[in-house]
């Protein structure tokens, strides 16, 4: 048997983080078994479905690095097929027309509520002859669900789950306007797409019982279900926007790398021993549903950020530069020159050691692409206001101005010689040097910075600082 999974989001908003994890688990399960991962857009809610949301879903899945097989299926386009199945069930006596009005149904629910009874449709038209039907009256089509016994689902995550059939009513398959309901569309599409495993959030578990009954009524093989626990916030409450229930695109914009997000989402509910850092290749090899827990996972933004820092430190410098350039151009409002981009690429090794997100990296890299005279932050300006610091900086400028090889080693050696000659520690030389070159009290190793900037730019920034540059707004070169 070829394993076939699917991810089936509704295009009524962004691809949220829980949906991203569901897509990942389906993708991993399919790839682990050498099967297929399909994508279906459940756009039957025409009032809320938008083209922009569809594109956001596509973009989010692609950004996560999840490829799907074949063309994405648009559910609304298959409405005729869904209705066809309902009519076939009518012909076979497995479904029936219900002529109850909304007022009648409301009255039934209110009576049940008053008596403390479960609010379920009582099957009024289930066995009534067609001759009782009001002439020309609108009707819905309902499934004639089993009234006795129980429905049992062997769930790969939750174990055996069961419900007494008298707890389920006869669900609507076709509305009064002839359009299919979500429950009908899902079952027909999963069958026609050959889905073997339905992996989704456990908030769909109650739907599974009704869908199971519909599969049986149609005489189709029921797929294997796996309902994964939802993601909660750090406080144990259902994940919301205040916890970080944002769209996948928001995490991209906050500067997270897709490989870090994949790793983090994987560990939200799935484990492989004590392994925390898991590559995508390892995840494909190791992923099984046996290792998915039954308890909700808690979203930890700090842990995600630290994990992202790990992946940034190990990422290719050229790739990080490509991601960084548009962020810096957005910050500065100017296109970066080829020289600035080359400078970023050369200095990336030092830059990425400190940053945990691409946004942090962009903030820390601004000084590399800033135009002269360089803006100084408050601490750097205070340093340059100190006469001893400026004297040390001026002396260092003289020391390196005619230096032969402009490398971090020769530049550091020159600073050490000067510090020793002036009876100071190296930090006393490095502090004003960092202020002049980076406009800040924090930067990558300062002699590495000088090597990246080059002789002309470094000496020019030192001259600017000694000339009394004050804090302004930096712009890109």
From Swiss-Prot:
Motif 'KMSKS' region boundaries: 238-242
Coiled coil (UniProt feature): none
Gene Ontology molecular function: ATP binding; glutamate-tRNA ligase activity; tRNA binding; zinc ion binding
Places the protein is found: Cytoplasm
One GO location term (cellular component): cytosol
Gene3D superfamilies assigned to the protein according to its UniProt record, in alphabetical order: 1.10.10.350, HUPs
Annotated GO biological process: glutamyl-tRNA aminoacylation
EC number of the protein: 6.1.1.17
Catalytic activity reported: tRNA(Glu) + L-glutamate + ATP = L-glutamyl-tRNA(Glu) + AMP + diphosphate
Pfam families, alphabetized: Anticodon_2, tRNA-synt_1c
Subunit structure and binding partners: Monomer.
Protein name: Glutamate--tRNA ligase 2
Higher taxonomy: Bacteria, Pseudomonadati, Pseudomonadota, Alphaproteobacteria, Rhodospirillales
């Amino acid at each position: 048997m070829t394993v076939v999974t699917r991810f089936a989001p509704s295009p009524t908003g962004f691809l949220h983080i829980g949906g991203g994890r569901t897509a990942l688990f389906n993708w991993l399960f399919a790839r682990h078994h050498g099967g297929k991962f399909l994508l279906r857009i459940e756009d039957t809610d025409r009032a809320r479905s938008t083209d922009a949301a569809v594109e956001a879903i596509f973009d989010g899945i692609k950004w996560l690095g999840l490829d799907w097989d074949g063309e994405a299926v648009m559910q609304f386009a298959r409405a005729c097929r869904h209705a066809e199945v309902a009519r076939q069930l009518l012909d076979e006596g497995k479904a029936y027309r219900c002529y109850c009005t909304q007022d009648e149904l409301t009255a039934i629910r209110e009576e049940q509520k008053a008596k403390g009874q479960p609010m379920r449709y009582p099957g009024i038209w289930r066995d009534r002859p067609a001759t009782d039907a009001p002439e020309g009256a609108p009707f819905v089509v309902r499934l004639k669900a089993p009234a006795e016994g129980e429905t049992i689902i062997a769930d790969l995550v939750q174990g055996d789950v069961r419900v007494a059939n008298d707890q389920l009513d006869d669900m609507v398959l076709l509305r009064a306007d002839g359009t299919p309901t979500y429950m009908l569309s899902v079952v027909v599409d999963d069958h026609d797409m050959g889905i073997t495993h339905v992996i989704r959030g456990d908030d769909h578990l109650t739907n599974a019982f009704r869908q199971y009954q519909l599969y049986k009524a149609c005489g189709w093989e029921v797929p294997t279900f796996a309902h994964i626990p939802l993601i909660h916030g750090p406080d144990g409450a259902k994940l919301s926007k205040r916890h970080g229930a944002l769209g996948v695109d928001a995490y991209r914009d906050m500067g997270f790398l897709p490989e870090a997000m994949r790793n983090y989402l994987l560990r939200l509910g799935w484990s492989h021993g004590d392994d925390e850092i898991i590559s995508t290749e390892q995840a494909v090899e190791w992923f099984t549903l046996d290792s998915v827990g039954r308890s909700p996972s808690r979203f930890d933004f700090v842990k995600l950020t630290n994990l992202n820092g790990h992946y940034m430190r190990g990422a290719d410098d050229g790739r990080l530069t490509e991601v960084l350039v548009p962020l810096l151009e957005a910050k500065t409002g100017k296109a970066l020159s080829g020289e600035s981009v080359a400078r970023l690429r050369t200095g990336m090794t030092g830059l990425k050691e400190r940053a945990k997100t691409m946004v942090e990296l962009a903030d820390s890299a601004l000084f590399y692409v800033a135009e002269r005279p360089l803006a100084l932050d408050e601490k750097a300006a205070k340093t340059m206001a100190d006469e001893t610091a400026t004297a040390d900086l001026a002396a260092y400028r003289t020391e390196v101005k005619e230096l032969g090889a402009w490398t971090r080693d020769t530049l550091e050696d020159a600073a050490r010689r000067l510090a020793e000659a002036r009876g100071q520690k190296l930090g006393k030389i490095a502090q004003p040097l960092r202020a002049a070159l980076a406009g800040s009290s924090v930067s990558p190793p300062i002699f590495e910075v000088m090597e990246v900037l080059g002789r002309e730019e470094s000496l020019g920034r030192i001259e600017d600082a000694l000339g009394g540059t004050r804090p302004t707004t930096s712009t890109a070169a």
